[in-house]
Regions:
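Acidic, low-complexity/disordered tracts enriched in E/D and polar residues
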Residues: 1-39, 43-46
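Long, charge-rich, low-complexity alpha-helical segments
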Residues: 30-87
């Protein structure tokens, strides 16, 4: 998995936010507000080769079952793909 768009992660007023930077500003309109889980997935995304790598990191970090972690990862990555942020 590779991040295709330049995105800047920020925490503002307790919210986890992705802000388009560079040329991504031209392609994407607005900010992406993420849950704590989404922010965690974003933080490990650049180190992960597969969705399963991210799921395993979630299982290490959170008290969650594998099925829930898989669903959360699949949903979040699906949204990033929808907006062309990742491959």
């Amino acid at each position: 998995m590779q991040i295709k768009k330049e995105m800047i992660y920020r925490q503002l007023a307790g919210d986890n936010i992705l802000v388009p930077g560079g040329n991504a500003v031209l392609d994407l309109n607005g900010l992406f507000v993420m849950t704590e889980t989404g922010a965690f997935i974003w933080s490990v995304l650049s180190q992960a080769e597969t969705e399963e790598d991210i799921v395993n990191k979630m299982l290490e970090e959170y008290d969650v079952d594998r099925e829930t972690a898989q669903e959360d990862v699949k949903e979040f990555l699906g949204r990033l793909r929808e907006y062309g942020i990742i491959d």
